[in-house]
C-alpha cells in the first residue's frame, strides 16, 4: 500500500510532462461534455411539473378536500354555506378560477385569474398568506400580478409594493382616498374586456419561485364582478377538524352528488397535471435516456484515448517494482481527480446550458394549468450526472488493468490487436443486437429505451467492420490524388498501433450523430403530425370567431351565444355555426372536449380517427348521444366501439362510443361530441367559438372585415381565417415541443464539442510521431494536410455510420411516441436531417481541430522513435 503523499508524488511527476497534462485536460473536457449533456437533459425532464406542484401546495395550504365544478360556468356559492355547515368542517372557503388575459401598454399575457376568499390569508397556503385583512380591504377593486408578468405587459412596478404595504397599510389606505395609487390595465375574460387596476406586484420575496407562474390574484367578490360570475364559484376548499375525516368526506360526497361536483383532495390539480404531462414527460424521458447514453459514451470514448499513455505508466511502475495494489491505487487516484474535475466543470456547463435553453414554458399545457417557467433541479438529477461522470472516469482509467493481470506484459501491436475469436464475437453480438432492436420496433415499440441501447450496442459492435470498409474505399480513392499527404493519412488510418484510438474517434462521431439524428428525426415526425392536426381541425370553416389571446387557441373559453345573432344577417355570410368546447376532468385526466356544430363539414378529421369506420363515426356524431374518444381514455374506461358510458359533465349524460381517436395533440386526450349534445350535457348554450362559412364569391378579407365591424371595437372576440388559426396552433405546438427541441440541440452541441475534444486529444498524442516523421523531410504544410485528411476520414466515417443507425433510431423513437403518448405522428425517414447532422458535426469539428493540427506539425524533427 502507498501513502497519499506517495500517490501525489507519482501523480505530480506524470503531470510534469506537458503531453500528459494536455491529454488529462482533454479527457476532463470529454467527460465534462457528457456530464453537461446528461445534467441538462435531466433538468428538462423534471422541470415541467414543478411549477404546478408548487402552486398547488402554496395555494391550498392545510386544506384537505375540494369540491370542484365540472364546467367553466361554476356552481352557486350557496354550496359554500352547505359545506361549512357539515359536522366536522372547520372551514369552507370559495375560490373562483378563470382563464383571463391581462393587457397593458406593452402587450398582453395569459393568466389564471384566482379570486380568493379573504380568509385564505390566514388559513390558506403561503401564496395568499402574505396578504393580511387590511391589504385585502385596500385592494377590493384591484388585482395582483407576479412582477415578471407586470413588467412584460408594461405595467411597471406599482406605486405600492406588496412587501412595503404591510408597513404602510393605514397610511396607504388614507392616501388612496385622496387620489389613485394604482396603475390602470385591462382584463379580458372571454369576450368581456374590463378596466381594472394593478394594485400590487408579487415579488420573489413574497412567493418564491412561484413568481414565474402565470397567475393573477384578486378578492373573490371582485373576480366574480369582472368575470360576470356573480354568485358563482368554481371550487370550495374544505378544512377538516382532527379525527373527523371520514364523517366529513361522507357529507361532502352527498353534497357533491347533489350539486354534480367533483370531490377530490385539495391538491388534486397536481395529480391532474401529472397525468396531463405524462406523455410529454415520457417522450422527454425517452429522449433524455438516449442523451444520457450518448453523454456516457462520449465520456468513455474520451478516456479510451488516454489508455496507451496509462499502459506506459503501468509498465514503468512494474519495472520499478510496484505491486499490483500500488498500481491500482495510482490509477484510481488518477480516475478520481479526472472524474471530480470533469463533474464540476460538466455541472457548471450544464447549468449554463439549462438556464439558457430551458427558459420558455410549454404553452400547450398552460391552457388548462398555470404552468410556470422556473427550472427545477433535484438532487437525483445531480447525483445521476455525477455518478455517470465518475463511472466513465474509473472505467476509462482502469481499462489497462487487463495488462496487469497478463504475465508477461503485452506490448505495442500485441496489445492493440484483437484475437480472431473476439472479432467473431463482435460480429455475432452486433447482429443479435440489431435483431433485438428490430423485434422491439415491430412488437414492443414502447420499450424504445431498451431498443435504443441495443441499437447503439449493435452500431459499436459492427463499427470496426464498417470503418475498415470506409478506409478501404478511401484507399482506392486516394490513388487518383497521387499526393503524399493522402498516403501518410492512409498509413496512419491502417496502422495497428493507433487502431484503438482511431476507432474511439469514429465511435464518438457515430454516437454523436446517432443521438442527433434519432432525436431530431423523431421530434420532426411528431411536429409534422401536430401540423397535420392543426390543419385538419381548423380548415373545416372559413372564419373562426373566439375570445382573443393565445390562451384560447383550443377554443375552451365560453361567451354568450347571442353574438351569433349579430352576424347571421350579414350579406357576405352563408352560415354561422356555434362551436362549443371546454376542459373536463375524467378520472385523473383533464380532457379536452370538442363539440363542433352538427352540420360541420367534418366533425372528426380523417387523420385523427385511429380505430373505427370514418363514414359510420361521422354519421353517428351527427346524431344524438355518440362520442369519439381518445384511445388512452377508452382503454382506461375499458370501452369498446358501440358501448355506452356516462360522461361526468355538469349534467351527467350517457353517450355511446362511435370510434377511437388520437389525443388530438392534447396529451390527456380528447372527447368529440356535437355542439347540441354538449349544450345538453353542460346545461348551457354558451359558445366557445363561431364557425363562419362565407357566401360564394366573397373574399376572406372582405368577409373578415364585415364580421369585425359587426362585433364592434370593444369586443374581446378575435376573427381569424382558418390559415391564421392553423398558424397559431402550429406555433403553440412548437412551444410545447420546445423541451424536445432543446434536448436535440444540446445533443448536437455536445456532439461537436466531444468530437473536437477527442480529435484534439488524438492530434496532441501524435506530436512525437509527427516529429519522428519530419526527419524524412516532410514540410509542415504536407503534414498538416495529412492530419486534415486523416481527421476528415475519421469524422466522416464515424458520422456516416452514426447517421445510418440514427435513421433506424428515428423510426424506433417515432413508433414509441405513437404507442406510448398517443400523439398523432407522421412517421417517416428524414434523410435531410441525417445529412445535415453529418455535415454540421463533421465541418464544425474539423474546423476546430485544424488549429491544434497546425500547432502539432510545428514540432521539431527528432530521430527518437516514439514508444
Enumerate the predicted regions with their spans.
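Membrane transport/envelope proteins' first extracytoplasmic loop
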Residues: 2-296, 305-308, 363-364, 534-539, ...
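Alpha-helical transmembrane segments
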Residues: 14, 21-23, 33-62, 77, ...
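Alpha-helical transmembrane segments, especially those used as permease/efflux helices
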Residues: 1-30, 249-257, 279-282, 286, ...
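Juxtamembrane segments of multi-pass membrane proteins
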Residues: 61-74, 453, 459-616, 631, ...
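Small-residue-rich transmembrane alpha-helices
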Residues: 300-303, 337-368, 380-406, 432-444, ...
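Short beta-strand boundary microenvironments
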Residues: 111-171, 532, 539, 552, ...
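Hydrophobic alpha-helical transmembrane segments of multi-pass inner-membrane transport and secretion
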Residues: 20-46, 278-315, 336-350, 388-395, ...
Amino acid at each position: 500500500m502507498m501513502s497519499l503523499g506517495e500517490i501525489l508524488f507519482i501523480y505530480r511527476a506524470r503531470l510534469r510532462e506537458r503531453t500528459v497534462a494536455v491529454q488529462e485536460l482533454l479527457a476532463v473536457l470529454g467527460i465534462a461534455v457528457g456530464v453537461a449533456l446528461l445534467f441538462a437533459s435531466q433538468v428538462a425532464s423534471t422541470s415541467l411539473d414543478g411549477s404546478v406542484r408548487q402552486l398547488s401546495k402554496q395555494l391550498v395550504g392545510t386544506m384537505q378536500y375540494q369540491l370542484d365544478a365540472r364546467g367553466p360556468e361554476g356552481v352557486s356559492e350557496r354550496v359554500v354555506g352547505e359545506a361549512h355547515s357539515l359536522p366536522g368542517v372547520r372551514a369552507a372557503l370559495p375560490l373562483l378560477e378563470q382563464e383571463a388575459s391581462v393587457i397593458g401598454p406593452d402587450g398582453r399575457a395569459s393568466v389564471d385569474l384566482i379570486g380568493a376568499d379573504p380568509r385564505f390569508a390566514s388559513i390558506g397556503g403561503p401564496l395568499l398568506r402574505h396578504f393580511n385583512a387590511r391589504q385585502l380591504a385596500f385592494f377590493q377593486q384591484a388585482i395582483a400580478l407576479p412582477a415578471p408578468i407586470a413588467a412584460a405587459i408594461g405595467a411597471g412596478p406599482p406605486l405600492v409594493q406588496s412587501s412595503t404595504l404591510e408597513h404602510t397599510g393605514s397610511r396607504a389606505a388614507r392616501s388612496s382616498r385622496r387620489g389613485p395609487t394604482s396603475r390602470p390595465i385591462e382584463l379580458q375574460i372571454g369576450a368581456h374586456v374590463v378596466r381594472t387596476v394593478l394594485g400590487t406586484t408579487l415579488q420573489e420575496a413574497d412567493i418564491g419561485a412561484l413568481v414565474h407562474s402565470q397567475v393573477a390574484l384578486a378578492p373573490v367578490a371582485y373576480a366574480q364582478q369582472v368575470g360576470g360570475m356573480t354568485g358563482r364559484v368554481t371550487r370550495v376548499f374544505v378544512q377538516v377538524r382532527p379525527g373527523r375525516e371520514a364523517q366529513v368526506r361522507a357529507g361532502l360526497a352527498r353534497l357533491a352528488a347533489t350539486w354534480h361536483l367533483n370531490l377530490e383532495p385539495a391538491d388534486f390539480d397536481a395529480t391532474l397535471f401529472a397525468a396531463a404531462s405524462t406523455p410529454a414527460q415520457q417522450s422527454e424521458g425517452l429522449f433524455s435516456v438516449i442523451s444520457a447514453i450518448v453523454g456516457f459514451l462520449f465520456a468513455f470514448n474520451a478516456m479510451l484515448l488516454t489508455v496507451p499513455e496509462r499502459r506506459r505508466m503501468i509498465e514503468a511502475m512494474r519495472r520499478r517494482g510496484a505491486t499490483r495494489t500500488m498500481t491500482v491505487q495510482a490509477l484510481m487516484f488518477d480516475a478520481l481527480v479526472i472524474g471530480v474535475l470533469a463533474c464540476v466543470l460538466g455541472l457548471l456547463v450544464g447549468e449554463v446550458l439549462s438556464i439558457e435553453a430551458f427558459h420558455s414554458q410549454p404553452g400547450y399545457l398552460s391552457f388548462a394549468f398555470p404552468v410556470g417557467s422556473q427550472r427545477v433541479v433535484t438532487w437525483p438529477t445531480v447525483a445521476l450526472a455525477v455518478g455517470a461522470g465518475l463511472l466513465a472516469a474509473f472505467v476509462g482509467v482502469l481499462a489497462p488493468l487487463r495488462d496487469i493481470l497478463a504475465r508477461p506484459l503485452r506490448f505495442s501491436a500485441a496489445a492493440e490487436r484483437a484475437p480472431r475469436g473476439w472479432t467473431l464475437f463482435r460480429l455475432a453480438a452486433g447482429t443479435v443486437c440489431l435483431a433485438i432492436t428490430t423485434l422491439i420496433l415491430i412488437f414492443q415499440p414502447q420499450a424504445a429505451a431498451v431498443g435504443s441501447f441495443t441499437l447503439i450496442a449493435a452500431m459499436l459492435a459492427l463499427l470496426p467492420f464498417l470503418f475498415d470498409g470506409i478506409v478501404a474505399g478511401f484507399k482506392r480513392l486516394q490513388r487518383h490524388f497521387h499526393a503524399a499527404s493522402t498516403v501518410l493519412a492512409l498509413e496512419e488510418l491502417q496502422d495497428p498501433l493507433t487502431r484503438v484510438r482511431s476507432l474511439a474517434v469514429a465511435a464518438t462521431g457515430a454516437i454523436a450523430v446517432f443521438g442527433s439524428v434519432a432525436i431530431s428525426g423523431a421530434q420532426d415526425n411528431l411536429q409534422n403530425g401536430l401540423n397535420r392536426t392543426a390543419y385538419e381541425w381548423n380548415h373545416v370553416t372559413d372564419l373562426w370567431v373566439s375570445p382573443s389571446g393565445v390562451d384560447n387557441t383550443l377554443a375552451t373559453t365560453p361567451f354568450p351565444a347571442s353574438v351569433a345573432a349579430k352576424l347571421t344577417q350579414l350579406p357576405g355570410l352563408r352560415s354561422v355555426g356555434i362551436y362549443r368546447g371546454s376542459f373536463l376532468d375524467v378520472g385523473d385526466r383533464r380532457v379536452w372536449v370538442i363539440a363542433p356544430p352538427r352540420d360541420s363539414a367534418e366533425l372528426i378529421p380523417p387523420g385523427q380517427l385511429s380505430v373505427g369506420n370514418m363514414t359510420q363515426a361521422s354519421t353517428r356524431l351527427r346524431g344524438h348521444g355518440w362520442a369519439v374518444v381518445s384511445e388512452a381514455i377508452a382503454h382506461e374506461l375499458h370501452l369498446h366501439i358501440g358501448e355506452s358510458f356516462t360522461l361526468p359533465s355538469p349534467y351527467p349524460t350517457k353517450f355511446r362510443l362511435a370510434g377511437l381517436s388520437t389525443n388530438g395533440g392534447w396529451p390527456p386526450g380528447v372527447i368529440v361530441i356535437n355542439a347540441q349534445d354538449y349544450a345538453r350535457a353542460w346545461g348551457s348554450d354558451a359558445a366557445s367559438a363561431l364557425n363562419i362559412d362565407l357566401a360564394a364569391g366573397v373574399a376572406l378579407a372582405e368577409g373578415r372585415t364585415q364580421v369585425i365591424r359587426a362585433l364592434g371595437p370593444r369586443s374581446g372576440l378575435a376573427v381569424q381565417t382558418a390559415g391564421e388559426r392553423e398558424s397559431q396552433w402550429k406555433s403553440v405546438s412548437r412551444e410545447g415541443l420546445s423541451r424536445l427541441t432543446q434536448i436535440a440541440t444540446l445533443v448536437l452541441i455536445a456532439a461537436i464539442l466531444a468530437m473536437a475534444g477527442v480529435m484534439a486529444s488524438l492530434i496532441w498524442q501524435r506530436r512525437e510521431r509527427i516529429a519522428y516523421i519530419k526527419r524524412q523531410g516532410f514540410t509542415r504544410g504536407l503534414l498538416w494536410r495529412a492530419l486534415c485528411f486523416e481527421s476528415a476520414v475519421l469524422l466522416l466515417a464515424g458520422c456516416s455510420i452514426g447517421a445510418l443507425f440514427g435513421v433506424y433510431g428515428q423510426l424506433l423513437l417515432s413508433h414509441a411516441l405513437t404507442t406510448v403518448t398517443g400523439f398523432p405522428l407522421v412517421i417517416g425517414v428524414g434523410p435531410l436531417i441525417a445529412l445535415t447532422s453529418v455535415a454540421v458535426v463533421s465541418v464544425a469539428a474539423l474546423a476546430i481541430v485544424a488549429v491544434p493540427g497546425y500547432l502539432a506539425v510545428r514540432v521539431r524533427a527528432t530521430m527518437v522513435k516514439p514508444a
